[in-house]
């Protein structure tokens, strides 16, 4: 099944996607795309421990990710007013400007979960066929 939904000004992008996934009981899916804008961004850059926080207008250039049982793992790319692009892990606190349009595709033949991997130090994706 495919899902398309729209968020409006002030909504938290990450939290609202997670709420949508929980409401629709989605267990395995991909975030195919999103378009829209933010007025506040919280992202974790590659290999960084801290979250980058910026309060300024951004266009959502890309949003992709995997959705597993009880968890979304998403990466976002944002362009500022000069066209400079930053990207990283989508964190709580990314607040929608005028709109954000989200497209999710459910993966009917899979169950996706995450388990801690001692090698990487992160919860990594576990893929099981139904």
Model-derived segments and spans:
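N-terminal intrinsically disordered, cationic/polar leader segments
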Residues: 1-73, 77-130
